[in-house]
Amino acid sequence: MIDEDISKIAETLSKEEFKLNNDERIINALERIATSLEIIAHNKIHNTKLKNNANPISSNNVFNSINNDSQYIENFLMKKGVTIKFVPEINSEINDVLYSLASFMGNNYSKISSVYKAIKSRLSSGESVKIDMKNFTQEEISYSCQFCHNLYELTFLDYYKYLKSPKYQIILAPNRIPLVINFLTGHWLESYVVYEIKKLINYFNIKKEVSFLLNPQICLPNGDDFELDILFSVDDNIYWIESKTSDYHHYVEKYSKVAKILNSENLHPYLLLTEVPQQTCNKLTNLFGMKVLNIENFSEFLFRELEQYKTHIIPEEAYNVENNENE
């Protein structure tokens, strides 16, 4: 009898212990269910915005003040034995609104990178993600929330919620329309580069001939197909900029080989990376003979590079007014 009672007590205690061990998992599961239900209910309203605003085209396109005749660049490539197979039209979806978003991302990348990478990791599934920001600095929290707010306003996020102290969490779910996937998986970085170039061309009031050739699909002299990111010229100088938001290891050597094929005193090749410290970039530059830049230093570098072409600097007040009109 005593043995039987002990057995029952042990069984009861075991069940209680199992219950206690599973409390946290149950709570977490309930939180996930509640979040999912909130997202589903919220999307019924928010998806109406998506239909109306998925392709907001601004009348002040970033290229309006730039001569986009790329003949000089194309002639240079042909002289190097390169065949231009296809040049896509400028993407009308990447308008001033998205250029402004790309500029925000590029100029504040170190502050938003954790949230950006969390969003990017959910683009294939569209699932919600909870981001714990307890270890973020106040600046990182502020910029991350601003970033998510901007994405949400543009319907790039299906759902966004910020939980203040003591939780300090962001809960979000990305929108999976092609525009969003294309932009956030990497095209934002190209857009950032183009936007910064255009901004400085206006700032320095450059009167030299300026042109762009974006994403041309080419055939190299050895028959290999290749696609370049950004080519732009100022006067006789051509700048070639490749950009990578993730794994760069398989590309550096390829870019280096293409740079050797295109080698000229008028060609300036660069590789822009987001996840690599400048010290490592310097080592890659020395190893592959192609200037490698970290995103944190890109704006300053570009400023110094284009300053040599300045006619005169537009007064700061006029510059700010112009930017405000384009945003």
Residue ranges and their predicted role:
Residues 1-52:
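Extended alpha-helical segments
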Residues 30, 48-327:
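Intrinsically disordered, low-complexity Ser/Thr/Pro/Gly-rich regulatory segments
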